[in-house]
């Protein structure tokens, strides 16, 4: 019987060491060597203090900043420990009521014309750090007015921070809200 169990135990130990120790250490080493910023969360610091991550959205308030898309992560939104979408069906009355309220709030804040879809819809994770260029441009007037800046200067800033499709064909053009707001803080 021991002759039958020995190969099984040997394989268990070998694969445990291979997949539980060697592989994770190798991948961590490769990540830290080739992509140290991304492997550590793409954290952004200002004055030695971490102000956010380029990979995780955060709630931004205040008229002088660009706002991210709505979040369904946690009760108050943007809870990284509770990342999720709303899981509401497209026919859900609760979803319809929330979107209607969001559209009304945007209209009250001065939005005119078409409203970008991501201005009123949540992402799958609830923590998307990006918004569409259309949603960013919709906010230019409000942000410029709050900061006493020319709209053209803020529009130029947005245009310069639009990220294209990955590898030229995957995804949609987008703007990282944290990058945009930090760049906005440098304008005079």
Curated annotation (Swiss-Prot):
GO terms for cellular component: plasma membrane. The chain crosses the membrane at residues 11-31. It comes from the Bacteria. GO terms for molecular function: ATP binding; P-type potassium transmembrane transporter activity. Keywords: ATP-binding, Cell inner membrane, Cell membrane, Ion transport, Membrane, Nucleotide-binding, Potassium, Potassium transport, Transmembrane, Transmembrane helix, Transport. Pfam families: KdpC. Its main location: membrane. It is a single-pass membrane protein. It is found in: Cell inner membrane. Belongs to the KdpC family. NCBIfam families: kdpC (TIGR00681), PRK00315.1 (NF001454). The system is composed of three essential subunits: KdpA, KdpB and KdpC. This is Potassium-transporting ATPase KdpC subunit. It comes from Azorhizobium caulinodans (strain ATCC 43989 / DSM 5975 / JCM 20966 / LMG 6465 / NBRC 14845 / NCIMB 13405 / ORS 571).
């Amino acid at each position: 019987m021991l002759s039958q169990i020995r190969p099984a135990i040997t394989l268990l130990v070998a694969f445990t060491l291979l997949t539980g120790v060697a592989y994770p250490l190798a991948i961590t080493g490769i990540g830290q060597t080739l992509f140290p910023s991304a492997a550590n969360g793409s954290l952004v610091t200002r004055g030695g203090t971490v102000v956010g991550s380029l990979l995780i959205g955060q709630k931004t308030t205040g008229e002088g900043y660009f706002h991210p898309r709505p979040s369904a992560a946690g009760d108050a939104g943007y809870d990284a420990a509770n990342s999720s979408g709303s899981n509401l069906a497209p026919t859900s009355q609760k979803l319809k009521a929330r979107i209607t309220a969001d559209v009304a709030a945007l209209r009250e804040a001065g939005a005119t014309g078409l409203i970008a879809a991501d201005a009123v819809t949540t992402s799958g994770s609830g923590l998307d750090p990006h918004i569409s260029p259309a949603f960013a441009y919709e906010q230019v007037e409000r942000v410029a007015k709050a900061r006493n800046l020319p709209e053209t200067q803020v529009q130029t800033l947005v245009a310069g921070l639009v990220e294209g499709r990955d590898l030229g064909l995957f995804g949609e053009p987008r703007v990282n809200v944290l990058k945009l707001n930090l760049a906005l803080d440098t304008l005079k």
